[in-house]
Amino acid sequence: AYSSEGYVLHTSDGRTYLYLQHLDDNDYRYVNVFRLDQGMPSYVGYEGMAWYNAQILDPDSFVLYTRLDVLGTYYGMKRYHVDEAGLPASDDEAYVINESSMLRSTRDLAVTILEKNGSETEATVLSGTGYTIFRTDGASYADAHLNDGRDCRIQIKEGSRGWGWDIDGVSEEECFEWFPYAG
């Protein structure tokens, strides 16, 4: 690691943990967790997520970011709390993505339109539409703002080639012009 920084977290039931964020190659960050209240510090575990520039002020509610490779490379945010083992645990189903590039479709796509009132409607969105990813569970769907003002859910499955994603059985590369994947 090139640098490290940490937070000491005190839980309401008297446990104390050190969350240590490390900066590694390619700006990759990760967290090691140590328990501090049992005499000698003990290693609890590793998490491939980090707080970056956020602050951890409350062990019951803090933000961590995870690198996601879903229709591009993004950092997804979830709210976490310290669980019984001392590791971060989230009740959030999906990651929120704050910074994303617009993807332009190269074919008509079957999506679920997410209505403002909470209802959902199946629709086909025409080729040439712009999609900006804003939320994903990292495994089965990506939600996007469309350039016509609507929001939609794109169902995804692990790519049939062993990498990437398929949308309706078609490789993501055949559905969009390009992706902002890192590396």
Roles of regions detected by a PLM:
Residues 6-10, 15-21, 28-35, 130-133, ...:
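Ordered hydrophobic segments in well-structured contexts
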